[in-house]
């Protein structure tokens, strides 16, 4: 079992049960998935951008990303329906816990001027969204091979019913929230 998963089973689960007074063990919030998304508007002009972004995301996530396509044509963005405009990967189970462990303990401290993540970025249903400005914070990415600095969106989906429960769950994993 992964370190973060063991921590959840041993400490976080009981702490959440004590704090919120759940009657049923299935009520206790848990992580369900982590989604990484990279929107690449410049991929319209250069297909190599998409390939390198896919390779970098595969390195970061440990899983091959899928391409995302434009749902409709937008003249202002110079895109047509069905053109590839990004890539995403959904992590579950062990890979999700491994990624989150690396993100919290290695990648997040490497963010420039990092003082913690905003605790207001919950969506009202216990899920947390954050953006990363550069992929270089991940140790898997070789600085020499990077052709452009790209950011990504990270969504942490939980089974929590409220933002307070979701925040308590992530704090149990030592997620660095701003005070």
UniProtKB/Swiss-Prot annotation:
A Pfam family reported for this protein in Swiss-Prot or TrEMBL: Ribosomal_L5_C
Keyword Ribonucleoprotein: yes
Alphabetical UniProt keywords: Ribonucleoprotein, Ribosomal protein, RNA-binding, rRNA-binding, tRNA-binding
Entry GO terms, CC: ribonucleoprotein complex; ribosome
Keyword rRNA-binding: yes
InterPro entries (UniProt xref): Ribosomal_uL5 (IPR002132), Ribosomal_uL5_bac-type (IPR020930), Ribosomal_uL5_C (IPR031309), Ribosomal_uL5_CS (IPR020929), Ribosomal_uL5_dom_sf (IPR022803), Ribosomal_uL5_N (IPR031310)
Signal peptide (UniProt feature, chain positions): none
Gene Ontology molecular function: rRNA binding; structural constituent of ribosome; tRNA binding
GO annotation terms (biological process): translation
Taxonomic superkingdom: Bacteria
Function: This is one of the proteins that bind and probably mediate the attachment of the 5S RNA into the large ribosomal subunit, where it forms part of the central protuberance. In the 70S ribosome it contacts protein S13 of the 30S subunit (bridge B1b), connecting the 2 subunits; this bridge is implicated in subunit movement. Contacts the P site tRNA; the 5S rRNA and some of its associated proteins might help stabilize positioning of ribosome-bound tRNAs.
Family: Belongs to the universal ribosomal protein uL5 family.
Record text on subunit structure and interactions: Part of the 50S ribosomal subunit; part of the 5S rRNA/L5/L18/L25 subcomplex. Contacts the 5S rRNA and the P site tRNA. Forms a bridge to the 30S subunit in the 70S ribosome.
This protein's name: Large ribosomal subunit protein uL5
